[in-house]
Swiss-Prot record:
This is GMP synthase [glutamine-hydrolyzing]. It comes from Alkalilimnicola ehrlichii (strain ATCC BAA-1101 / DSM 17681 / MLHE-1). One of its GO terms (molecular function) is GMP synthase activity. The active site is at C86, H181, E183. Pathway: Purine metabolism; GMP biosynthesis; GMP from XMP (L-Gln route): step 1/1. Homodimer.
Length: 525
């Protein structure tokens, strides 16, 4: 029996902040398990969670209006520490007898906070020291309202020139509030502050580690499926690859993977998947060559949404055909991860600003008889990657750039043809190869080539060429919600362009996409 790595846990109540998942990731990085509930989740669910501490997120609402979101009474009745961040601090202060007011001076962006070191939360944590010896913190602010009166039992623990009450604390009860955001990277000491809260104040040990998570998942999978057979659709993406490695470690030959090669994958991707899983790891993988079927279904279709639906439906059709032949299978495995399952079902009133519901596979038939096993559903993407490394997957597979579900089908503008897919595969491979060779691959968040179905005149030697155009796209982003185009060196782009044009008959021109998100999206379709 492995140790219970969920025993010491933190509950984060989401008041609608864009940073709520970031709070959870920081707590997990500190080695402590946590979950996110909506601020108006049923009080019984909050009590039953058994939290060692609560974190109240920021949010877009105001405590100065009558119907602003409130902290559930179950939080203050639990007798455990509470940390309020931004709106969470204001809500806690207002409900415990303090005063919160709207302010004419809104504070967004960098600020320097004077940290009064007499609190358990901030003691000895600082970026700088003032001439008078006060500890100073560089932080990220994002607020309009502010606390103007301390609740009974609280003391001032942080302040700025424009926000005299930027942090409050009641050491006896373990209640703290900070007006700034410790979860963002713009607050350099933020990880230390959150670690201090979960470890020293809440008393949680650092049990949430990749090795412990793998042991826990293996034990739970074995308990869930017993001696039954399990089927997994293996795409070559990070999530399904980690599920395959994990299930193979847990149940061995009880796992069968179906890898559908739709002809819209990156260069040599199908062979790489088979080499990693079938030959190297010994996983039972059925490879289905369905290129002709996918291309036939896409013939004459140029609308991006129709292409997506056709590719998705065709994948399900091919997968179902294979599943029907495996009559002894009882379970369907999926690579659902935690952001997929944070949904409004946790909201009692329906007013909470929470992330939309999402299911890993939208095309599951209603009459499906297979039971679902989703071993990654508690994990964030960065945790999935660390688990992949722990399971022995190659780093270049685990840290590969995101690839859309429809594959090259949405990187070929307009109609998808085999000729276009073959040209794009080669151009994309050269771009990625050179990014790796110049140590640029890990400096960008996503990079790929796009096929433009237009011809452009070119010159080779004494002859003219009238051939196709590809665009290169590389972006830098933290969350993929916004992104800036990567400012790759001109010499590098020149080198890549010359290689593509010289080495790929059929391409005569290369463009570089310098559009940010917004206004553009990262993918072209």
């Amino acid at each position: 029996m492995t140790q219970d790595i969920h025993a010491h846990r933190i509950l984060i109540l989401d008041f609608g902040s864009q940073y709520t998942q970031l709070i959870a990731r920081r707590v997990r990085e500190a080695g402590v398990y946590c979950e996110i509930y909506a601020w108006d989740a049923p009080e019984t669910a909050i009590r039953d969670f058994g939290a060692a501490g609560f974190i109240l997120s920021g949010g877009p609402e105001s405590m100065t209006v009558d119907n602003g979101p409130r902290v559930p009474e179950a939080v203050f009745q639990a007798g455990v520490p509470v940390l309020g961040i931004c709106y969470g601090m204001q809500a806690m202060a207002g409900q415990l007898g303090g005063r919160v007011e709207a302010s004419d001076h809104k504070e967004f962006g960098y600020a320097r906070v004077r940290a009064r070191g007499h609190s358990r939360l901030l003691r000895d944590i600082e970026d700088h020291a003032s001439p008078e010896g006060w500890g100073l913190l560089d932080v990220w602010m994002s607020h309009g309202d502010r606390v103007t009166g301390l609740p009974p039992g609280f003391k001032l623990i942080a302040s700025t020139e424009s926000c005299p009450i930027a942090g409050i604390g009641d050491d006896e009860r373990g209640y703290y509030g900070v007006q700034f955001h410790p979860e963002v990277t713009h607050t350099p000491q933020g990880a230390r502050i959150l670690s201090r809260f979960v470890h020293e104040i809440c008393g949680c040990p650092a049990d949430w580690t990749p090795g412990n998570i793998v042991d826990d998942l293996i034990e739970r999978v074995r308990r869930q499926v017993g001696g039954d057979k399990v089927l997994l659709g293996l795409s070559g993406g990070v999530d399904s690859s980690v599920v395959a490695a994990l299930l193979h470690r847990a149940i061995g030959d009880q796992l069968t993977c179906v890898f559908v090669d739709n002809g819209l994958l990156r260069k040599d991707e199908g062979d790489q998947v088979m080499a990693t899983f079938a030959r190297h790891m010994g996983v039972n993988v059925i490879r289905v060559d369905a290129e002709a079927r996918f291309l036939e279904a896409l013939k004459g279709v140029d609308d991006p949404e129709r292409k997506r639906k056709i590719i998705g439906n065709m994948f399900i059709e091919v997968f179902d055909e294979q599943a029907a032949r495996l009559t002894e299978v009882d379970w369907l495995a999926q690579g659902t991860i935690y952001p997929d399952v944070i949904e409004s079902a946790g909201s009692a009133t329906g007013k909470a600003h929470v992330i939309k519901s999402h299911h890993n596979v939208g095309g599951l038939p209603e009459d499906m008889t297979l039971k679902l096993v989703e071993p990654l559903r508690e994990l964030f993407k960065d945790e999935v990657r660390r688990i992949g490394l722990e399971l022995g997957l190659p780093a270049d597979m685990v840290y590969r750039h995101p690839f859309p579900g429809p594959g090259l089908g949405v990187r070929i503008l307009g109609e998808v043809r085999k000729e276009y897919a073959d040209l794009l595969r080669e151009a994309d491979a050269i771009f990625i190869e050179e990014l790796r060779a110049h140590d640029l691959y890990d400096q960008v968040s996503q990079a790929f080539a796009v096929f433009l179905p237009v011809k452009s005149v070119g010159v080779t030697g004494d002859g003219r060429r009238y051939e196709y155009v590809v665009a290169l796209r590389a972006v830098e982003t933290i969350d993929f919600m916004t992104a800036r185009w990567a400012h790759l060196p001109y010499e590098f782009l020149d080198h890549v362009s010359r290689r593509i044009i010289n080495e790929i008959p059929g391409i005569s021109r290369v463009a570089y996409d310098i559009s940010g998100k917004p206004p553009a999206t990262i993918e072209w379709e």
